[in-house]
């Protein structure tokens, strides 16, 4: 059995049932009788609850719509990948040889799913009161400053102002596709400015994916 002590130290949690951590780290490509999809489903629900409560208490003057948008900026593939990297989760996941060749250990979708599964596993074994401080600690370590200015920015509007000034044109968003089960569908959007592709992003709705893509484009334009 592999040594998970470093991962458990990063989590500040020791699994009593090691089979649970193995299941949480096993991607479906690994072709075992088990994989992390069920734990991922559970983790997604629990993360939404914990982050939702955290934001409710942190931003007492924000309305429901604002809180939903702030949570959506954290509880998504990009956000979970960031948290997964915080605990170096890619070093521990079980993936197929083909996924290894395709750099699966750094793939956002695989890392995000594994992070949700690990959180689901901790919840299953030890409950909400144990899991909550773990999630909030990782969240606050990964995001230096969680505030409304950072999390509730309208990147699409900001980008359009930049492109109109620089290129006399507006960005074009193309829906590249959608994937995932109905309860957890993700949309992928590419962004084009003046005929040039500035990247892709995904989100739980087309609007959120467009916001994420706009942020990527803003960051790239700053470097040009």
From Swiss-Prot:
It comes from the Bacteria. GO terms for biological process: mRNA processing; regulation of gene expression; rRNA processing; tRNA processing. Keywords: Cytoplasm, Endonuclease, Hydrolase, Magnesium, Metal-binding, mRNA processing, Nuclease, RNA-binding, rRNA processing, rRNA-binding, tRNA processing. The keyword Chloroplast does not apply. Homodimer. GO terms for molecular function: double-stranded RNA binding; metal ion binding; ribonuclease III activity; rRNA binding. Residues 154-223 form the DRBM domain. The keyword Glycosyltransferase does not apply. It is found in: Cytoplasm. Residues 4-127 form the RNase III domain. Its EC number is 3.1.26.3. GO terms for cellular component: cytoplasm. Mg(2+) binds at residues 40, 113, 116. The active site is at 44, 116. It catalyses: Endonucleolytic cleavage to 5'-phosphomonoester. PROSITE patterns: DS_RBD, RNASE_3_1, RNASE_3_2. Signal peptide: none annotated. Its cofactor is Mg(2+). PANTHER family: RIBONUCLEASE 3 (PTHR11207:SF0), RIBONUCLEASE III (PTHR11207). This is Ribonuclease 3. Digests double-stranded RNA. Involved in the processing of primary rRNA transcript to yield the immediate precursors to the large and small rRNAs (23S and 16S). Processes some mRNAs, and tRNAs when they are encoded in the rRNA operon. Processes pre-crRNA and tracrRNA of type II CRISPR loci if present in the organism. The gene is rnc.
């Amino acid at each position: 059995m592999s040594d998970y002590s470093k991962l458990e130290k990063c989590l500040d949690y020791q699994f009593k049932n090691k089979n649970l951590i193995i299941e949480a780290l096993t991607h479906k490509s690994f072709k075992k009788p088990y994989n992390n999809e069920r734990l991922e489903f559970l983790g997604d629900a629990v993360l939404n609850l914990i982050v939702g409560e955290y934001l409710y208490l942190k931003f007492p003057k924000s309305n429901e719509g604002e809180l939903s948008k702030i949570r959506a900026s954290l509880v998504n593939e990009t956000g979970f990948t960031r948290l997964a990297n915080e605990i170096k989760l890619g070093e521990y996941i079980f993936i197929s040889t083909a996924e290894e060749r395709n750099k699966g250990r750094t793939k956002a979708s695989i890392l995000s799913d594994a992070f949700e599964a690990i959180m689901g596993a901790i919840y299953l074994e030890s409950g909400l009161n144990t899991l909550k401080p773990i999630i909030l600690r990782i969240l606050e370590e990964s995001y230096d400053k969680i505030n409304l200015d950072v999390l509730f920015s309208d990147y699409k509007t900001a980008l359009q102002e930049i492109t109109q000034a620089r290129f006399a044109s507006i960005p074009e968003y193309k829906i590249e596709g959608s994937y995932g089960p109905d309860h957890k569908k993700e949309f992928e959007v590419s962004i084009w400015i003046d005929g040039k592709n500035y990247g892709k992003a995904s989100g739980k709705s087309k609007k959120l994916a467009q916001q994420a893509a706009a942020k990527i484009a803003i960051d790239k334009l700053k470097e040009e």
